[in-house]
């Protein structure tokens, strides 16, 4: 599969000298942010990514660890001049490298030089990334192994939609992938099962939950007078497989916003990112009274929402940690296979905590009831948290941040004991 690209890679890497490697490594090490590093604490160098950064921020605020950071994009770009584009394949890259000792040697030299240069500022006790199989992390894993530094993962991937686990198992088998780091922390037991074929010892996969949700656990219910939002979480992207449904939902949502204008309710469309925001802004009907946002945190938005509308989205799982009512629009549905859904509307446990609008008329009626101030919340706190726990581990005691701290310190101590 990789024979021609591998030959090209060998030629390219052969031309990349030891001085080139050292120069690239020094340059990359200068990009590390050492903000708020406290002397005497273990220091973890993290490869900063979207979402993952939310977990790191919680860890920084609620553990006794330092977290220095470097952009994962910069780690990737530092290697692009000598790793051909057609070889930069997630999951597959690790086995490919191990087909040639010379390639391994140069990657290890780069990773090792980067870590040595970084450690001249502050000793690095562990490195932590957001994925266990990204190609650009292989050099850092090799450098960590050479220097006796634990390479850890706090996985931002969470394989709780049923089809994703067999898909990952097959991908791991096809790629002959093995994780060459020290340990993986993940958010759910389903994710541990999904990742297990790629990790030599399943005990090195810890189920910790997600630190970003620690602050959600003690959200106090807001009085009805403060619940002034009706919130639509967008699902217009092709991956949802429900673009026509979203168009109908958006049109009805906009119509209600116009009809209820000036009555003290904000009809908010929560977009995923700026591009999503611009697309939605261009298609909303004239005369609406919608507010659009892409950067308002759900943590702030859901507690003041009377109703949250969404479809096959982690945002609806997150809403289970609040007392916001939730509705899934469910008509003209092309995806009938339950394995495709994060929350299956035909599951009785889901229907106990979430409204399922099976027609446009049912959906419109729920919007009207929310506008009138009716309390539409379904399910008890325990039922809602049980649904959340299907997808994200909730600690029996303590916090996810504490569980991740324990995970990190375990491997730091293990590495220290083997030196």
What are these regions (language model features)?
Residues 1-78:
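N-terminal subdomain of nucleotide-sugar transferases
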Residues 7-30, 155, 171-241, 372, ...:
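A nucleotide-sugar donor-handling region in carbohydrate enzymes
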Residues 46-57, 74-215:
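Active-site and donor-binding regions of nucleotide-sugar-utilizing enzymes
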Residues 114, 272-322:
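Donor nucleotide-activated moiety binding/catalytic core segment of transferases
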Residues 199-202, 207, 285, 314-392:
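Catalytic binding pocket for nucleotide-activated donors in carbohydrate/polymer assembly enzymes
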Residues 211-283:
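Conserved catalytic-core segment of nucleotide-activated headgroup transferases in glycan assembly
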Residues 394-419:
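C-terminal alpha-helical cap of glycosyltransferases
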């Amino acid at each position: 599969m990789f024979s021609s690209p591998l030959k090209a890679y060998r030629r390219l890497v052969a031309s990349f000298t030891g001085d080139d490697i050292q120069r690239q490594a020094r340059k990359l090490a200068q990009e590390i942010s050492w903000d708020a590093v406290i002397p005497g604490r273990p220091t973890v160098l993290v490869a900063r990514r979207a979402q993952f950064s939310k977990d790191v921020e919680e860890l920084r605020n609620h553990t006794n660890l330092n977290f220095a950071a470097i952009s994962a994009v910069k780690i990737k770009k530092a290697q692009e001049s000598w790793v051909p584009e057609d070889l930069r394949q997630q999951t597959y890259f690790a086995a490919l490298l191990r087909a040639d000792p010379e390639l391994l040697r140069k990657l290890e030299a780069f990773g090792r030089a980067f870590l040595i240069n970084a450690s001249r500022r502050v000793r690095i006790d562990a490195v932590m990334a957001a994925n266990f199989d990204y190609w650009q992390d292989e050099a850092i894993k090799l450098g960590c192994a050479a220097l006796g530094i634990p390479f850890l993962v706090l996985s931002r991937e969470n394989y709780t939609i049923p089809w994703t686990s067999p898909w990952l198992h097959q991908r791991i088998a096809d790629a002959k992938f093995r994780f060459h780091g020290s340990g993986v922390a993940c958010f759910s037991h389903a994710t541990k099962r999904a990742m297990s074929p790629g990790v030599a010892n399943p005990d090195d996969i810890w189920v910790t939950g997600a630190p970003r949700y620690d602050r959600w656990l003690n959200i106090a219910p807001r009085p009805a007078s403060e619940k002034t939002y009706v919130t639509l979480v967008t699902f217009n992207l092709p991956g949802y497989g429900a673009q026509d449904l979203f168009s109908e939902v958006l049109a009805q949502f906009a119509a209600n916003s116009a009809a209820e204008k000036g009555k003290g309710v904000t009809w908010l469309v929560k977009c995923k990112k700026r591009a999503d925001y611009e697309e939605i802004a261009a298609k909303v009907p004239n005369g609406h009274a919608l507010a659009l946002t892409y950067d308002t945190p759900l943590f702030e938005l859901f507690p003041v929402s009377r109703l949250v509308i969404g479809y096959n989205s982690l945002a609806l799982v997150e809403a289970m940690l609040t007392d916001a009512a939730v509705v899934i629009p469910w008509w003209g549905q092309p995806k009938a296979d339950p394995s495709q859904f994060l929350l299956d509307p035909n599951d009785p446990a889901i229907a106990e905590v979430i409204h399922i609008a099976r027609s446009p008329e049912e959906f419109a009626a729920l919007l009207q009831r929310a506008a009138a101030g009716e309390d539409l919340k379904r399910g008890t706190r325990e039922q809602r948290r049980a649904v959340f726990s299907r997808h994200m581990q909730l600690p029996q005691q303590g916090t996810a941040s504490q569980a991740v701290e324990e995970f990190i310190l375990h491997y730091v101590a293990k590495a220290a004991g083997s030196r």
